[in-house]
Regions:
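Alpha-helical propensity feature that highlights long, continuous alpha-helices across diverse contexts
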Residues: 1-163
Length: 163
């Protein structure tokens, strides 16, 4: 995280934002920002996405990707059809020194099929397509959170320095 020597309570803001994002299915968050008033300023974060919790917290995404949601929820105590794990929101490294929503992307979708004979290529392709179809919507939600975080940080900065 970059602070550029700002005196306002960045840590408190980030901790509150982290707590909010954790209720939305995001965890292991690392924040970065630059500001305020230059081209390329912004805020971003990287971390892990618990797909089921993320979809539960974002009904607009869940409703657009019902098949994916059904694949990741257990029914009647059974394992979900697709056991998902390690979905990463990663920072694009080396592209720029900026810290804003366009410097991150979904990095990996790792998943396994439930123990039903180990799955086959057709099943893997099916679930991979479900994930890939949802990728843009999931990124868009995360990027909206990044813009929201930047607005909060920017507001706190100007309140502190311009009173």
């Amino acid at each position: 995280m970059m602070s550029d020597g700002f005196d306002f309570q960045v840590e408190d803001i980030l901790e509150d934002f982290r707590d909010m994002l954790e209720t939305k299915g995001l965890s292991d968050l690392v924040f970065d920002y630059s500001g305020f008033g230059s081209q390329g300023d912004g805020a971003c974060f990287t971390g892990d996405i618990d797909l089921k919790n993320f979809l539960d917290a974002h009904p607009e995404v869940r409703n657009n990707h019902r098949e994916l949601y059904i694949a990741v929820i257990p029914f009647d105590g059974e394992e979900p059809a697709c056991d998902y794990y390690d979905i990463k929101l990663t920072k694009i490294v080396g592209r720029s020194s900026y810290s804003h929503e366009n410097t991150v992307h979904l990095g990996s979708w790792d998943y396994t099929l439930a123990n039903k004979g180990g799955g086959n290529e057709r099943e893997y392709t099916y679930y991979e397509n479900l994930f890939m179809n949802a990728e843009k919507d999931i990124e868009d939600v995360c990027k909206a959170y990044m813009r929201q975080l930047y607005r909060i940080l920017e507001g706190a900065y100007y309140k502190e320095y311009e009173g």
